[in-house]
């Protein structure tokens, strides 16, 4: 299991467009991917799992990847967050 935390810097938080792009990025990997904000968790490969968290600017999220390609998934997803959110 690999994970990282990230503080959202996008003024609008995780809204529809980047959430869709994030789901597409996560879908490239076979490992299980989860996003969490506090006690709430969602499946990073499902748009509703991401949007239901209602992540806003300045909030911290934790992304967890578990499975065969977890190292590659964590690296790619962390880069995505830094570039887009």
Show which residues each predicted segment covers.
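Short amphipathic
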Residues: 1-8
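Short non-domain terminal segments
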Residues: 2, 46, 78-79
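C-terminal structural segments of small proteins and small subunits
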Residues: 51-85
């Amino acid at each position: 299991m690999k994970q990282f935390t990230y503080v959202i810097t996008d003024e609008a938080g995780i809204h529809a467009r980047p959430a869709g792009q994030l789901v597409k990025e996560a879908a490239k990997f076979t490992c299980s991917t989860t996003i969490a904000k506090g006690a709430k968790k969602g499946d990073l490969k499902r748009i509703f799992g991401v949007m239901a968290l209602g992540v806003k600017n300045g909030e911290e999220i934790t992304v967890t990847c578990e499975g065969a390609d977890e190292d590659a998934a964590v690296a790619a997803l962390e880069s995505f967050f830094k570039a887009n959110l």
